[in-house]
Amino acid sequence: MQRFIKWLAVITSLDLLIVLLGGALVTKTGSGQGCGKSWPLCNGEFVPSNLSMETIIELSHRLTSGSAGILVTLLCILSWKYYKHVRETKTLAILSFVFLVAQALMGAAAVVWGQMPAVLAIHFGISLISFASVILLTCLIFEIDQKFDARSLIMDKKMKFHIYGVTIYCYLVVYTGALVRHERASLACPDFPLCSKNRPMPTQLHEWVQMGHRLAAMLIFVWILYAMILAIRHYKQQPVVYWGWIISFILVTLQAIVGILVVFTNASLAMALLHSLFISCLFAVLCYLVMLGTRSKVNAKEAASTSKQTK
């Protein structure tokens, strides 16, 4: 059974990633109304008779979201039953399921009542939490923490501050990026790093949205760089923290490069999807570090208790 659960966890994680990228594809191609204002049917039909490209993209996104719902539900039930001895399992199972349901409801609401940019940005943010929760659940199922000796990990307050702070801030940056996409402001500023050669400062709403996202992205790049330097200096003996921050920096660097290429490739579809891919992976890695941070206090108490008993 455990072998089956591991395969299920991997497939579910990949399915949710496809859902995230599919949502970005729907937005990029303007396929949000590919099935009209009909939900769960498509243009009022179970199998639409007229299949335009927009309809195929939107319908595919709905089907992958539906399959993700089934897989996440099954994974939550089985992990709850067979991995309940791991402290975070129940919490992650609940988060995975609740946020997936919320994601589906937000998606349905966007179809039926109109696609407001702010609502669509929230839709992506909710999807990201569900994806990260399933990734963490998968890590627990594969016992990644045991392989890196993470169960005895103890962090200082400074490192935990950076982990929690960067993760929360990353989530806010995600919303600014989603707002750029849904406000169709990706090309509002045709130059980089300034908005335009002729107008270095933004003058209209779409330009402010774009430049605000760039500023937020620059700050998270610097913050992760600083946290990585701390990890390299002080956590070489804790590989999960050491490599966690190095991987985070690699991902945020790739994210920044792709973000710049979005501007210079006229917002090509490939760059837009890679932009969504890298931020999803970065957020999942940061959430794993958060989970380790929550364990650190418990580990410190257990270490202190063991030390007293030894004396």
Curated annotation (Swiss-Prot):
Group of enzyme by EC: oxidoreductase
Cofactor requirements of the protein: heme b
Membrane spanning residue stretches: 7-27, 63-83, 92-112, 122-142, 160-180, 212-232, 244-264, 272-292
Keyword Acyltransferase on entry: no
Enzyme Commission number(s) from the entry: 1.17.99.9
Binding site for heme o: 61, 123
Entry membrane topology: Multi-pass membrane protein
Disulfide feature: 35-42, 189-195
Gene Ontology biological-process entries: heme A biosynthetic process
Catalyzed chemical reaction(s): Fe(II)-heme o + 2 A + H2O = Fe(II)-heme a + 2 AH2
GO molecular function, one term: oxidoreductase activity, acting on NAD(P)H, heme protein as acceptor
Keywords: Cell membrane, Disulfide bond, Heme biosynthesis, Iron, Membrane, Metal-binding, Oxidoreductase, Transmembrane, Transmembrane helix
Top-rank taxon, per record: Bacteria
Assembly information from the UniProt record: Interacts with CtaB.
Family statement: Belongs to the COX15/CtaA family. Type 1 subfamily.
Name of the featured protein: Heme A synthase
Species in which this protein is naturally found: Bacillus anthracis
Lineage, broadest ranks: Bacteria, Bacillati, Bacillota, Bacilli, Bacillales
Primary gene name: ctaA
